[in-house]
Amino acid sequence: MLTLEKKRLIPKLDSNGYYTVGLRHNSPDVDPEREYTEEEVDAFFEEDKKMYEDDVNEIYDPVFMNQRMFDACFCFAFSVGRISGTDLGNLIKKNPYDDRIWDFWRYTYTQGKKNKVLVMRRIKEVNYYFGED
């Protein structure tokens, strides 16, 4: 995931109108007027990471899924907010090798417009999920 995101010390307004800092950390506490330290943004990531790991663990089955699948689901959840309880998460939980999973990684729109960066990210995520680099 670190190759898909850039760690920012200065808050940036994202395409949804929220200020983010570090690795896409957004919260009402993010102050757009200040620069954060490496330690602060690393701490934000550790907090956020735990939340998304817990979310992916809701659908993850270590008997039938591998680490690559977990990591790809984590990246997807980190990007969109969650994966458990979604149509994609439910499909993965039912059958992590279902070909229809490819279709869900086509979510590439931001505010109704196709986002070229998101297209590339989703391609990397789904290819990683299915073991294709």
Which residues fall in each region the model found?
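Short, functionally critical alpha-helical segments immediately adjacent to catalytic or ligand/cofactor-binding
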Residues: M1-K6, F70-F78
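Long, amphipathic alpha-helical surface segments
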Residues: L2-Y18, H25, V30, Y36, ...
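Short, structured surface segments that line ligand/substrate-binding pockets
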Residues: E58-R68, A72, F76
